[in-house]
UniProtKB/Swiss-Prot annotation:
NCBIfam families: hisT_truA. It catalyses: uridine(38/39/40) in tRNA = pseudouridine(38/39/40) in tRNA. It comes from Bacillus cereus (strain ATCC 14579 / DSM 31 / CCUG 7414 / JCM 2152 / NBRC 15305 / NCIMB 9373 / NCTC 2599 / NRRL B-3711). The lineage of its organism: Bacteria, Bacillati, Bacillota, Bacilli, Bacillales. Homodimer. This is tRNA pseudouridine synthase A 2. Formation of pseudouridine at positions 38, 39 and 40 in the anticodon stem and loop of transfer RNAs. Its EC number is 5.4.99.12. Keywords: Isomerase, tRNA processing. Belongs to the tRNA pseudouridine synthase TruA family. Substrate binds at residue 111. Pfam families: PseudoU_synth_1. The active site is at 53 (nucleophile).
Length: 245
């Protein structure tokens, strides 16, 4: 059995997310599986490292699949890019150890979130950022972000779909940056609960708008109540930026 690792970029705007929900429906996983299965002449299942939601984008998603026959990597890449829609791109294909698992072997993930922070809309970025038309207090957002770095129970920053045995995750870095009309948030950690990144961004937006005190974050973490963060940041601004193994 041969195991192949795919590195993938996609514009998630028109898709229902990464995870296949039915028989090769409009998902990233479904589209890629359909083309690979056609290529090898049998049904193939791929495993992604991150099950991104509808509307979320990826600069470096990683997946793997297994094949009975040995495949030529550059030919696989060429075939996939020829037949996949042009909002999905395979940037690399390589054969890896048979025990490599894209989801379970990942050690760290980095997400980038883009906020368009001008009074006027940006029509070119409406599918690729969240528009906040009131000026954000980035200094306060940075102060709040410091409280979220480290190992914590992130129940308050998840949604009801998160049914993990442990809600503890470690955030390695959480940076807030201003750049040419944008406020960008980059977060790295050992793993993230469902909607955790979007809830973190939502909390930072609330802080930036003066709706939440930065010093309230430790209490929110401690109390573990999901209803304390009212803002779930839009999917459109979220990018899976990098995965480390």
């Amino acid at each position: 059995m041969h195991n192949y690792k795919l590195t993938i970029q996609y514009d998630g705007a028109r898709f229902k997310g990464w995870q296949r929900l039915g028989n090769n429906d409009n998902t990233i996983q479904g589209k890629i599986e359909s083309v690979i299965s056609e290529m090898v002449g049998k049904e193939i299942e791929i495993i992604g490292c991150s099950r991104t939601d509808a509307g979320v984008h990826a600069l470096n998603q990683v997946a793997n699949f297994q094949s009975d026959e040995k495949l030529v990597e550059h030919k696989v890449k060429k075939y996939l890019n020829q037949y996949l829609p042009n909002d999905i791109s395979i940037t690399n294909v390589e054969e890896v150890h048979d025990r490599f698992h894209a989801r379970y072997n990942s050690k760290a993930k980095t997400y980038l979130y883009k906020i368009w922070n001008e009074e006027h809309t940006n029509p070119f970025m409406r599918k690729y950022s969240m528009h906040v038309n009131k000026k954000l207090n980035v200094k306060s957002m940075k102060a709040a972000a410091k409280h979220l770095v480290g190992s914590h129970d992130f129940t308050a920053f998840s949604n009801a779909k998160s049914k993990k045995k442990s809600m503890v995750r470690e955030v390695y870095t959480l940076d807030v940056m201003e750049e040419a009309g944008f406020v960008q948030i980059r977060v790295s950690g050992n793993g993230f609960l469902h909607n955790m990144v979007r809830k973190i961004v939502g909390a930072l937006i609330e802080v930036g708008l003066g709706q939440l005190d930065a010093e309230a974050i430790p209490n929110i973490l401690e109390e573990k109540q999901r209803n304390q963060i009212n803002c779930l940041a839009e999917a459109s601004g979220l990018y899976l930026e990098n995965v480390e193994f």
